[in-house]
Amino acid sequence: MKIDDIIRKCIEIPGISIQRSDFSTELLLKEKEGKGSMTFFPLFPGVTIAYIFVNSPTWTAPNFREDSSIEKGPLLLNYCVTGRCEIILNNENFVYVKDGEISLTERFAQKQYVYPRRIYEGMEFFIDIDTLTAQSVWVQGEFDINFHKVVDRFCPDGATYISPATSEVEEILTKLWSLFDVSIPFSISQMKIYTL
């Protein structure tokens, strides 16, 4: 499943609109219960980062259930800066992340994302392993990363990996987080560096 397919499904949801610019795509949530935004920056073929800001108790998830052949999406690496996000995944697993935690999964939300504290801020990497393998060969060659092995180790049988971020990882993610407020296109080159 490609990031463009995910975004297309998202804008089918009432209350969600889209804004595009030269460097990013932004999904905007505006409902009577609250608002939010997800700003997507494509970094490499197969790797996109999204900055997430929510002030709402829920955000409706795109409906991938109508195509029952879709069990897995891209590899999702989520980092919760503040707040808490709870979801029931399409394999019926209930998962949540809270301040300073990371999660890794190939599964997607069934119906909605729930924010018990109402406020949520975080980042999510969308990693399309097939595209990354085919079009960003240098990443795997230079950094000796085999994402299929990452999935096998951390997400066996559709599991979701959740853990507090180590201090080293949190330092990098905090730098990435701060780049959202830096002017474009300088920030994008920095996002690429810290992502690697």
Question: Which functions belong to the PLM regions below?
Answer:
Residues 88-196:
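Alpha-helical bundle regulatory/interaction domains
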Residues 9-10, 21, 25, 81-84, ...:
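Short hydrophobic/aromatic-rich motifs at helix boundaries and adjacent loops
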Residues 17, 28, 48, 86-88, ...:
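Ser/Thr- (and often Asn-) enriched beta-sheet segments in non-cytosolic proteins
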Residues 1-73:
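N-terminal low-complexity or simple alpha-helical regulatory segments
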Residues 8, 20, 65, 84, ...:
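Arginine residue identity/basic-tract feature
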Residues 49, 72-76, 120-124:
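Extracellular structured ligand-interaction cores
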Residues 54-57, 70-91, 129:
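Glycine- and acidic-residue-biased ligand/ion/polar-headgroup-sensing regions
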